[in-house]
Design a protein with these regions (language model features):
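A transmembrane-helix-recognition feature enriched in membrane-embedded lipid enzymes
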Residues: 2-46
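C-terminal accessory "lid"/substrate-recognition subdomains
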Residues: 2-10, 165-285, 337-341
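Residue-level signal for inorganic ion chemistry
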Residues: 26, 61, 112, 143, ...
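Walker A (P-loop) phosphate-binding motif
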Residues: 32-98
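Hydrophobic residues at beta-strand termini and immediately following loops
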Residues: 50, 119, 160, 217, ...
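Conserved beta-strand elements of the Class I
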Residues: 77-81, 158, 231-235
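Phosphate/Mg2+-binding loops and adjacent switch elements
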Residues: 84-209, 214
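Short, flexible loop segments at boundaries between secondary-structure elements
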Residues: 262-265, 304-335
Length: 341
């Protein structure tokens, strides 16, 4: 994941990239071959995949939620497919937000489950059948799995972070790419550039040259009220914590202290005690992300949670019609798939 990834992945290529290039070539060949030859089970419902070209966080979860909301506005019954993070179930498991913890199902599925049923399993096809048969879903949104899922995808929306782009442009282990861009673009239906920055410009141009539509969106706090004028100790265990810190600043909050943690981090009692003590001593308000709050829900004291502010965010598309277009094109592709049998 991004925060555990070597920093050189996000810098100009150097001797380490050169040294790892033979391994990257082997990985790239295997990954490309795997994507081309994968047997993908066809599901009796439209499947929209929210993926990314690289390892790590690009803001897929808020995008998946925004598109689920759009599907509901179009009178569809969406359901989410997720493999979870660290969760392990022999059979597909539908998330129960009242009883499941992030340790069991992952933090992202807990966030998704506030909006639609979520099936957690590495076997996306089995999860899909569960959502269709038992939960009445008629539109499936897959959170990640773009490269690996053994399920037919009707529309693949690939999310690229404008600030980080595709890093040094090399394939694992020399860089963050999960496969060569040319191999991944074959399976890409549309590209979504998230946020401000120029790091993604080259891959956006490459996608545009390949005839893929380019969309743009950004993250906004759900409510900016309450942040202005406050001094915060902000902490986060996500792919790129700096993005969260910037969002707090942009919403008018003053960041006196920041504490980044690894992606999907489970906080120990002494870490939470240190955060609380520092905030108290400095007269600061603790603030974190919705993902971190999902992990803390069953792992922190109620007293800590009561004093914690959580920054809820929304994905805002630069053009209002884009979410409806993506859902429509997913439905169109599914109808074409059914006609072909």
């Amino acid at each position: 994941v991004a925060s555990e990834a070597p920093p050189f992945w996000w810098e100009e290529p150097d001797w380490r990239v050169l040294a790892l290039s033979p391994l990257s070539a082997i990985y790239a060949a295997a990954a490309g071959r795997g994507m081309r030859r994968a047997k993908r089970e066809k599901i009796e419902a439209p499947v929209l995949c929210i993926g990314n070209f690289t390892v790590g966080g690009t803001g897929k979860t808020p995008v998946a939620i925004a598109l689920a909301k759009q599907a509901k506005r179009m009178r569809l019954k969406p359901g989410f497919l997720s493999r979870g993070h660290g969760g392990s179930f022999a059979e597909p498991h539908v998330v129960d937000i009242h009883h499941d913890s992030a340790r069991h199902v992952g933090d992202e599925p807990l966030l998704l489950a506030e909006h639609a049923p979520v099936a957690v399993t590495p076997n996306r096809a089995a999860g899909a059948r569960l959502l269709l048969e038992r939960h009445g879903c008629d539109f499936l949104i897959m959170d990640d799995g773009f490269q690996s899922a053994r399920i037919h995808i009707d529309y693949a929306l690939v999310v690229v972070d404008a600030r980080y782009g595709i890093g040094n442009g090399r394939v694992i282990p020399g860089g963050p790419l999960r496969a060569k861009i040319v191999d991944q673009l074959v399976f890409t239906s549309g590209l979504l550039k998230m946020g401000e920055g120029t790091a993604a410009d080259a891959v956006v141009r490459q996608a545009a040259r390949a005839g893929r539509p380019i969309f743009e969106a950004h993250i906004e706090p759900s409510s900016k009220a309450g942040l202005a004028g406050k001094r915060f100790l902000a902490f986060a265990g996500i792919g790129h914590p700096e993005k969260f810190f910037d969002t707090v600043r942009e919403a008018g909050g003053e960041l006196a202290l920041t504490r980044p943690f690894p992606d999907h981090h489970f906080y120990a009692e002494d870490e939470l005690a240190e955060l609380a003590a520092t905030a108290h001593a400095e007269g600061l308000v603790l603030i974190t992300t919705a993902k971190d709050a999902a992990r803390l829900r069953h792992g922190a004291s109620q007293d800590f949670l009561d004093r914690l502010e959580v920054l809820e965010i929304d994905t805002v598309f630069e053009l209002d019609h884009v979410p409806e277009r993506i859902i429509d094109e997913t439905l169109d592709a599914w109808r074409q798939r059914k006609l072909k049998g």
